[in-house]
Curated annotation (Swiss-Prot):
The lineage of its organism: Bacteria, Thermotogati, Thermotogota, Thermotogae, Thermotogales. It comes from Fervidobacterium nodosum (strain ATCC 35602 / DSM 5306 / Rt17-B1). ATP binds at residues 216-218, 225, 471, 523-526. This is Aspartate--tRNA ligase. One of its GO terms (biological process) is aspartyl-tRNA aminoacylation. Belongs to the class-II aminoacyl-tRNA synthetase family. Type 1 subfamily. PROSITE patterns: AA_TRNA_LIGASE_II. Its EC number is 6.1.1.12. It holds the Pfam family GAD. Its main location: cytoplasm. It catalyses: tRNA(Asp) + L-aspartate + ATP = L-aspartyl-tRNA(Asp) + AMP + diphosphate. L-aspartate binds at residues 170, 216, 438, 478.
Length: 576
């Protein structure tokens, strides 16, 4: 037997027991000849005492940190002055037996050391030994376990869908897998199980879920990985409200399982409201600083920059913030919004009851009216922008609002809401056509589509759950009629031949009795990161890739042999 107890298990009530522990050596101290070993495993830490007269004392001189050892001994209570607040801080083990199970070379760092992320990912097996990292993975497990528990108790079936499937690129690039048996043909790794879960609804499995790996070959950011995990859900005979209620209850349940209480009812705002107030379709409202329309205050202004914008049919917006402001800071903010195509920002501050600004002599009356309307307090600042493209201005001010918030506003707690009534389509400059904003299987508002509404204004039966400024889940009611699905394919520029080639199997399935259905998918990585209080999802993934898609532990992706390429019928093209 390697152990009778774990390193986080023993308490004062175990005094006098003979126990066996196994684990890693966290540290060794020598106090007047008495050796103290802190032994660590996944469950915690326990102090082991080796007295000079112990038969195992000589062994202690030949062990170091991160050795794996087995210790047998008697549990005793520590002296009152030696008790620590840790769960096992009341006791220690007096060793009578000690065995070295595995030696350790001098590691490049010790678990918990402050080292670069590159080092942590290269030696991930050392990094995961850090209790903080270990606890992140335990938390992730608890979220997944609670998900299965909740959905199983609500009549959902966990059904696995294929990883090797057909390439139907709409949006991000597919990861392609060459077929050895059918040379020149390729599987794709799924970006989501979207079509399979809809086909399961057509099959009569009315409540499906899966905790599933998905793959997207895209340029990466801090919150993206080429492979990621979704909590995937689909339901038959549902309206949007049914899916939203189920999803909200699920997220409340799984967060409660790890000790986080979310609001009893999530707020709901439209996409248009989110963009107008926060400049983002995933707003973090904890920062405050709602954007407001200020056009009315400047309609008679002679200030050249604003006057020209308004003459072109543009508008003026801004937000109030309790932050320091100077010409230098204003210049920094102007440079920031220039990255979004704006010319810069205007600003004014209420100081000693007076308007302070580099443009006060031109716009003092306008600034005073704004200050009065929005009840500005001493020291508050208004940041203002003007542009003839309202979408671009919303995006720029929204990004600036986030930058200011992260710099100056201390936030805590959880802001959870739904964003609904998304545009069904968005224009792709790159492709010169409309593309589906979510995916082309989302049900549009039929009254918009058939009522002559401009295509860019057609709404979708789509909904996103946002927590603390992160989109943690997105879903929609799906198209369950073949004629509507074919019309949508036509709108996004797919010919009948292309639609048949890519989605013929699905269009065929839509002919054989399809229940109205809808669903949602949550990012488990992001849900875990928010719960753990970390910004980067790599902190809650055991073996993540870098921002360039590399696994530093295994050095994947890597070259393969010519024999492997020949078997697949693949010839590599030299890059120019």
């Amino acid at each position: 037997m390697y152990r009778t107890h774990t390193c986080g298990e023993l308490r004062g009530t175990d005094e006098g027991k003979n126990v066996i522990l196994s684990g890693w050596i966290e540290r060794i101290r020598d106090l007047g000849g008495v050796k103290f070993i802190v032994l660590r495993d996944r469950y915690g830490k326990t102090q082991v005492v080796v007295n000079p007269d112990s038969p195992v004392y000589p062994i202690v001189n030949n062990i170091s940190r991160e050795y794996v050892i087995q210790v047998e001994g008697i549990v005793r209570k520590r002296p009152a002055e030696a008790i620590t607040p840790e769960p096992t801080g009341e006791i220690e083990i007096v060793a009578s037996e000690l065995k070295i199970l595995s030696k350790s070379e001098l590691p490049p760092f010790y678990p918990g050391d402050d080292v670069s992320e590159e080092m942590r990912l290269k030696y991930r097996y050392l990094d995961i030994r850090n209790p903080k990292m270990m606890n992140n993975l335990i938390l992730r497990h608890k979220l997944a376990f609670a998900t299965r528990e909740y959905l199983s108790n609500n009549n959902f079936l966990e059904v696995e869908t294929p990883y090797l499937t057909k390439s139907t690129p709409e949006g991000a690039r597919d990861f392609l897998v060459p077929s050895r048996l059918k040379k020149g043909n390729f599987y794709a790794l799924p970006q989501s199980p979207q079509l399979f879960k809809q086909i399961l609804m057509i099959s009569g499995i009315d409540r499906y879920f899966q905790i599933v790996r998905c793959f997207r070959d895209e340029d990466l950011r801090a919150d993206r990985q080429p492979e990621f995990t979704q909590i995937d859900i689909e339901m038959s005979f549902v309206h949007m409200e049914d899916v939203i209620n189920l999803a909200e209850n699920l997220i409340r349940y799984i967060y409660k399982a790890i000790g986080i209480e979310l609001p009893e009812k999530f707020d709901r705002i439209t996409y248009e409201e989110a963009m107008e107030k926060y400049g983002s379709d995933k707003p973090d409202r904890r920062y405050g600083m709602e954007m407001v329309d200020l056009t009315e205050f400047f309609k008679n202004s002679d200030f050249k920059i604003i006057k020209e914008v308004l003459e072109r049919g543009g508008s003026v917006k801004g937000f109030k913030a309790n932050i320091p402001m100077s010409r230098k800071i204003a210049d920094e903010y102007s440079e920031f919004v220039k990255g979004f195509g704006l010319g810069g920002v205007l600003w004014f501050k209420l100081e000693n009851g007076q308007i302070t600004s580099t443009t006060a002599k031109y716009l003092e009356n306008e600034y005073k009216a704004i200050a009065e309307k929005y009840n500005m307090n001493e020291g508050e600042v208004f940041i203002i922008a003007a542009h003839d493209n309202r979408e671009r201005m919303n995006e720029a001010l929204g990004a600036l609002r986030l930058k200011v918030g992260k710099q100056y506003v201390k936030v805590s707690g959880f802001d959870a809401l739904w964003v609904v009534d998304f545009p069904f389509l968005e224009w792709s400059e790159e492709e010169g056509r409309f593309v589906a904003r979510h995916h082309p299987f989302t049900m549009p508002y039929i009254e918009d589509l058939e009522g002559g509404v401009e295509l860019s204004k057609v709404r979708a039966h789509a909904y996103d759950m946002v927590i603390n400024g992160f989109e943690v889940g997105g879903g929609s009611i799906r198209i369950h009629r073949r004629d509507i699905q074919e019309k949508v394919f036509d709108i996004i520029g797919l010919t009948k031949e292309e639609a048949k080639e890519k989605f013929g199997f699905f269009l065929d399935a839509l002919q054989y009795g399809v229940p109205p259905h809808g669903g949602i998918a949550f990012g488990l990585d992001r849900l875990a990161a928010i719960a753990a209080g970390v910004d980067n999802i790599r902190e809650v993934i055991a073996f993540p890739k870098t921002s360039s898609g590399t696994c530093l532990l295994t050095n994947a992706p890597s070259a393969v042999t010519q024999f492997q390429l020949d078997e697949l019928g693949i010839a590599l093209k030299q890059s120019q």
